[in-house]
């Protein structure tokens, strides 16, 4: 997606705004801030749907005793092939989630508290959270259990609750009317409804809409297509000559990660092989995007979101990266 397409998808499709950024009073969707936060989290991390949609509050540093800033958390059970890696969440994405947690999530949690209390025997009731070690301890089916958060599969995350302001509430960041984590069908429904709104409100100011509706995975592609050329230009300088750029790209396949944008982004995405990430370079060669401005104001209102991501990626890459 381009910048304009992403903002249209997030703000008009998911967020209930009109194309001119005014409130859409005919909007009949639920929890627009949830959709916006989900989109910002997906784009800001480059993670797969199963990774960002199942994230828990402690993983983003949200909750009593947690530090609030940019966050890092480890995925394993919800990652593709169970491959362990570290996901970095920039401050703007955290801010977007904070807005949702402040304005919408409490009402959903309050409405579902009694229902969850009746079902507590079927839920994993978390009693202690170790933010430093990334572990939780609680009761499931009458048995005391302890888990590394990264090792918790999606079905366990969905039934994880803790004692909140209104009683039992989900430990998941994103919740629906039932009080627990939305499933794949729910997120698909949110996306389809967003597409219908985007098409219905399209006018001459609307950015180009593709023939097929966007998928959540397209935000992951956008992350790669923005971050990869940004790192390339930052580390190796701009190269307008197409043939030279292609030679440089081929050299990335065997280069050292410390000086290699391809391998840094490959690790960020959790690709099993740099060859998979290499495909993105074919798209960057046409220079469609204005890379100098590409990373400004994509997520929140700040100016450093993707520059922050790039700086963190370079820092991690220089030290060998996260967990491969």
Task: Go through each PLM region and give its residues.
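Short functional hotspots where side chains directly engage DNA or cofactors
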Residues: 65, 73-76, 215, 241-284, ...
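Short, basic (Lys/Arg/His-rich) helix/loop patches that form interaction surfaces
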Residues: 192-267
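Basic, Lys/Arg- and aromatic-enriched nucleic-acid-binding interface segment
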Residues: 11-49, 259
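Short, structured motif recognition centered on aromatic/hydrophobic residues
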Residues: 9, 41-42, 52, 96-103, ...
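Flexible interdomain linker/hinge and immediately adjacent N-terminus
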Residues: 1-18, 78, 177
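C-terminal secondary-structure termini that scaffold catalytic or DNA-interacting sites
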Residues: 275-278, 290-324
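A short, glycine-centered helix-capping/turn motif at helix boundaries
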Residues: 41-54, 230-235, 258-259, 269-272
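Conserved tyrosine-mediated DNA breakage-rejoining catalytic core shared by Y-recombinases
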Residues: 54-169
């Amino acid at each position: 997606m381009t910048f304009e397409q992403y903002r249209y998808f997030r703000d008009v499709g998911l967020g209930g705004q009109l194309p001119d950024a005014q409130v859409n009073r005919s909007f009949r969707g639920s929890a627009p801030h949830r959709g916006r936060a989900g989109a910002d989290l997906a784009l800001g991390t480059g993670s797969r749907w199963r990774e960002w949609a199942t994230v828990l509050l402690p993983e983003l540093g949200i909750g009593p005793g947690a530090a609030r800033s940019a966050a890092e958390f480890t995925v394993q059970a919800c990652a593709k092939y169970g491959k362990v890696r570290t996901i970095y969440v920039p401050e703007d994405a955290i801010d977007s989630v904070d807005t949702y947690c402040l304005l919408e999530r409490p009402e959903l949690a309050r409405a579902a508290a009694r229902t969850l209390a009746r079902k507590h025997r079927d839920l994993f009731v978390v009693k202690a959270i170790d933010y430093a070690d990334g572990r939780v301890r609680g009761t499931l089916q009458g048995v005391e259990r302890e888990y590394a958060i990264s090792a918790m599969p999606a079905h366990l995350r969905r039934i994880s609750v803790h004692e909140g302001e209104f009683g039992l509430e989900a430990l998941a960041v994103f919740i629906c009317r039932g009080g627990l984590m939305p499933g794949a069908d729910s997120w698909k429904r949110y996306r389809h409804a967003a597409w219908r709104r985007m098409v219905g409100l399209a006018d001459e100011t609307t950015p180009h809409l593709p023939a097929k509706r966007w998928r959540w995975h397209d935000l992951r592609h956008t992350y790669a297509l923005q971050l990869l050329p940004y790192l390339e230009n930052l580390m190796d300088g701009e190269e307008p000559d197409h043939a030279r750029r292609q030679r440089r790209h081929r050299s990335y396949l065997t280069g050292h990660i410390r000086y290699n944008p391809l391998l840094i982004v490959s690790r960020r995405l959790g690709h099993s092989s740099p060859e998979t990430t290499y495909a993105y370079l074919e798209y960057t060669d046409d220079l469609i995007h204005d890379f100098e401005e590409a990373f400004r104001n994509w997520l929140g209102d700040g100016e450093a979101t993707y520059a922050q991501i790039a700086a963190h990626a370079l820092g991690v890459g220089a030290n060998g990266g996260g967990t491969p």
